[in-house]
Structures are given as structure tokens and as C-alpha cells.
């Protein structure tokens, strides 16, 4: 189950933003991702964009998820406020109008403004490290001091009687950064450090004796209830529909004078706000540190949006249905020069979702797996995020067995969509960076901020 998603979601790691001095005039109003200096006053105002700019989606996180108390300190060398008329404009939620002034917090200052506080006590506080990967240990598990991630990996391997193989020479590095790369070597290191298989089996027996109390597998669905994940999908779907008056024109023509790329970019920009609302409804996401919430959304936004519009397009033939209500036909995509990636979306995602009749609960669980990405760069506690991802895995597997008992391979088939989402997500980022560089496609404020500061901590 884990193999399909390891290392996913760290999408900007391979795709750096183009130099912020690119000719695109829209980028002048966005904090650059280069080292911050004195505030930059653009010599010419940016040209008007089709929809009015709404500001950064991330003040919504800091306002509606609770302020961390004190504002993060300014990054080194930064003096003065960010003078950006676009980002500092009033945030208005879709379908909800503008909130009161106190609900709007200053935007996140690029990625260099993200402040991840060090763990209490610092590195020299006498904390034990995980014997397998070197991360912070959460205690002794199965006879060895280990982190929650390696504990969960070992437990799942034993309980499901999983077997692994190594693609290299069975001597892969297993550390905090690369522990998900090779499951075979990670498991061998668990055994080499002294983790006991029988301890897992005894724990399972104790869990059965207590009718699923404790940390037995039976508790996982309650910890990550799929009905709440479905509620999150349905809630943001309704919010998206409020801005749609009816099906738009096919191929981006008729009522929409824009080309397909512009339509897709504008739809993605609007959906970034909805994405924040969705994430807040996923169990346990709001309990993560505020900075980690921002990092996870930055790391997964493109895959999360692609998964949504792919599933929304199941009933559309040879095209996709945007959240704005517009249909984009593959012929239009080909004429706009994005036919190859468009066809990959149709064949690797939309048609596969259609063939297996993926339901919205399963879609929500896949998106939650993408969201809880322990490999996102800069997380203050990746182990905690990994535990949440494990809980989604367990809940999704239980749901598949109960809802589709006759389809034994359904859970695995769902997870096989995750590598395709990651690959397509990276390719879409490349296209967006190119459109931004040449500057002939209107890219709105939220989307531009994502491209200016692509989830990389300095």
C-alpha cells in the first residue's frame, strides 16, 4: 500500500521557479523568491487582469485556523512592509463576500518568511534518536528506540506480511531524508537494529483481546473517519458550484473568449482558495503547526487540483470540466500546444477513474494522502505528518473492503493513480513556469504567488 505514494507531493523539488526578473509584468506585484532586500516599488503598475485580484490564499489559513500568537520574525535583511497592492488587497471568499478586517492577516512573506520554530530544548536536549533513520525517537517500539514513522512501517510490514525488493545493491542509505526510498533496506535495518517481529504479533493479540482498544489496526478508521473526508469534498464542491451559472462553452469558445490555457489557469487560481477550505476540513490538518500547514499546501496544490478536475470530468468525453463550469475539449488543448499533457490527464487519470467508478470518498482519501506528505521540505515534524498519512491509508483500505468486498485489488488500484498524479503535476508546473516566463498568458494572483515562491525553504 505504501509503495504507490512514497516520496510523493514534493512537487517543486525538481522544478525551480524561473528567475524572478522574467519579462512577465505580472510578477512585479508579488514578493520574489530571491533573497529579500528593501521593498521594491515597481516602476510601472502591472496590467489589469481579467478577474479582480483577491490577494494571497494563505491569510485565510492564519485567520481561520487560529493565529500562532506572535507574527513570524522578519527574515534577515528584510526591512519594511511588503508593498504589494495585489497581495495586500482584501481577501474575499468565494460565495461569502469580504470578511471583517480583523479576519485578514498579513500574507506569508514568500517562503523565506516562513518561520519554523526549533523543537523545544533544541538538538542538545538529550532526546534519543531513531535507531533506523536518525529522526527524533518517540520512545521504545518493538524493542528499539524509533520514530513513529519507522514504528508504523515495521508494524505494517509484519501485519500485512509484506515482502520488498531492492533495486540497487541492498546497501541503500536509510536516514531521515531517504527512509522512504527503499523499503527493503529500511526493513532490513529495522531487523538489524533489533526490532522484534513477535512484539508486533503480541501487540495485535492484545488489541484483539481489548476489542480493538489501544493502537490496534481497528482504531485507524475512527482516527481518520472517511465520512469527514467525504464531507470535505462535498462542502468545497458546493462552494465551487455557487460561482457557476451553468455549463460553459465547449472548447473555451462561445461565452468564454479566452484560450484553454487561460481558462485552466483562471480556474486553478479560484480553486486555490477552495483548497484551503478543503484542507481545514480534513481531520487533524488544522492541529498541525501553522507553518507546516502552509508547507503542505504549497507542496501539493497542483496534484490536489489535478485530482479534483480529473474526477469532475468522469462524465465528459474527450475533455475536462473546470470548476468554473467551462468544458475544455482535447482539440482545443492540442491547438493551444498543450495536447500531450492534456491527453495524459485523460488517459492516465480521467479514464482510469471512470473505468473503476472511483467514488468521492476514495477521491477525498487520495487527496488527503497527497496533502499529508512527510517529504515536503521544511516541515517541523515530518513524523507527525507521516502518521496522519498512515491513518488515511488504513481508513481507505478498510473502506474499500467494506464497500467493495468483491474487488480485492481495489485499494491497490487506487494507490496506483498517485504516481501518475505526481508525474503529471510536475509536468503541469513546467508548463506554468513556461507560460509565466513568456508572459502572454494571464496568470492571476494566487497562482502567480505559488509560482514565485514554489514551496522551497531557503
Swiss-Prot record:
UniProt-listed SUPFAM superfamilies: Glucocorticoid receptor-like (DNA-binding domain), Nuclear receptor ligand-binding domain
GO BP terms in the entry: cardiac muscle cell proliferation; cell differentiation; cellular response to retinoic acid; in utero embryonic development; maternal placenta development; nervous system development; nuclear receptor-mediated signaling pathway; positive regulation of DNA-templated transcription
Compositionally skewed regions (Low complexity) per UniProt: 18-31, 57-68
DNA-binding region extent: 130-195
Protein name: Retinoic acid receptor RXR-beta
Lineage: Eukaryota, Metazoa, Chordata, Craniata, Vertebrata
UniProt GO molecular function: chromatin DNA binding; DNA-binding transcription activator activity, RNA polymerase II-specific; nuclear receptor activity; nuclear retinoic acid receptor binding; nuclear steroid receptor activity; nuclear thyroid hormone receptor binding; nuclear vitamin D receptor binding; protein-containing complex binding
Biased composition (Gly residues): 245-255
Spans annotated as Disordered: 1-105, 201-223, 238-261
Subunit structure: Homodimer (in vitro). Heterodimer with other retinoic acid receptor family members. Binds DNA preferentially as a RAR/RXR heterodimer. Interacts with NR1H3. Interacts with AKAP13.
Amino acid at each position: 500500500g505504501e509503495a504507490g505514494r512514497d516520496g510523493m507531493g514534493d512537487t517543486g523539488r525538481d522544478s525551480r521557479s524561473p528567475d524572478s526578473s522574467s519579462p512577465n509584468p505580472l510578477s512585479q506585484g508579488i514578493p520574489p523568491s530571491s533573497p529579500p532586500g528593501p521593498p521594491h516599488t515597481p516602476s510601472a503598475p502591472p496590467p489589469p487582469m481579467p478577474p479582480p485580484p483577491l490577494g494571497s490564499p494563505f491569510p485565510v489559513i492564519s485567520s481561520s485556523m487560529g493565529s500562532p500568537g506572535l507574527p513570524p520574525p522578519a527574515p534577515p535583511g528584510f526591512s519594511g512592509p511588503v508593498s504589494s497592492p495585489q497581495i495586500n488587497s482584501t481577501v474575499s471568499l468565494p460565495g461569502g463576500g469580504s470578511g471583517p478586517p480583523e479576519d485578514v492577516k498579513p500574507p506569508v512573506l514568500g517562503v523565506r518568511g516562513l518561520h519554523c520554530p526549533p523543537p523545544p530544548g533544541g538538538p542538545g536536549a538529550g532526546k534519543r534518536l531513531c535507531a533506523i533513520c536518525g529522526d527524533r525517537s518517540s520512545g521504545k517500539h518493538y524493542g528499539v528506540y524509533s520514530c513513529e514513522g519507522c514504528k508504523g512501517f515495521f508494524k505494517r510490514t509484519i501485519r500485512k506480511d509484506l515482502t520488498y525488493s531492492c533495486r540497487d545493491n541492498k546497501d541503500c542509505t536509510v536516514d531521515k531524508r531517504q527512509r522512504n526510498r527503499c523499503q527493503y533496506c529500511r526493513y532490513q535495518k529495522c531487523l538489524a537494529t533489533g526490532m522484534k517481529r513477535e512484539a508486533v504479533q503480541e501487540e495485535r493479540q492484545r488489541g484483539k483481546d481489548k476489542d480493538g482498544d489501544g493502537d490496534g489496526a481497528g482504531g485507524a478508521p475512527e482516527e481518520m473517519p472517511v465520512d469527514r473526508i467525504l464531507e470535505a469534498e462535498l462542502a468545497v464542491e458546493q462552494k465551487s458550484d455557487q460561482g457557476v451559472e451553468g455549463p460553459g462553452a465547449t472548447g473555451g469558445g462561445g461565452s468564454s473568449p479566452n484560450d484553454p490555457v487561460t481558462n485552466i489557469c483562471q480556474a486553478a487560481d479560484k480553486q486555490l482558495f477552495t483548497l484551503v477550505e478543503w484542507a481545514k476540513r480534513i481531520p487533524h490538518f488544522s492541529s498541525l503547526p501553522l507553518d507546516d500547514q502552509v508547507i503542505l499546501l504549497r507542496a501539493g496544490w497542483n496534484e490536489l487540483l489535478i485530482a479534483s478536475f480529473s474526477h469532475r470530468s468522469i462524465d465528459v468525453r474527450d475533455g475536462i470540466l473546470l470548476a468554473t463550469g467551462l468544458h475544455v475539449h482535447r482539440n482545443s488543448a492540442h491547438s493551444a500546444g498543450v495536447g500531450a499533457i492534456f491527453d495524459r490527464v485523460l488517459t492516465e487519470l480521467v479514464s482510469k477513474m471512470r473505468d473503476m467508478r472511483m467514488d468521492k470518498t476514495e477521491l477525498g482519501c487520495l487527496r488527503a494522502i497527497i496533502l499529508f506528505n512527510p517529504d515536503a521540505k521544511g516541515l517541523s515534524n515530518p513524523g507527525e505528518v507521516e502518521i496522519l498519512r498512515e491513518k488515511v491509508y488504513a481508513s481507505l483500505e478498510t473502506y474499500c473492503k467494506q464497500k467493495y468486498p468483491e474487488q480485492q485489488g481495489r485499494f491497490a488500484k487506487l494507490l496506483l493513480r498517485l504516481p501518475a498524479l505526481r508525474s503529471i503535476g510536475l509536468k503541469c508546473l513546467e508548463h506554468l513556469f513556461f507560460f509565466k516566463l513568456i508572459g502572454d498568458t494571464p496568470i492571476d494572483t494566487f497562482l502567480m504567488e505559488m509560482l514565485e515562491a514554489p514551496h522551497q525553504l531557503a
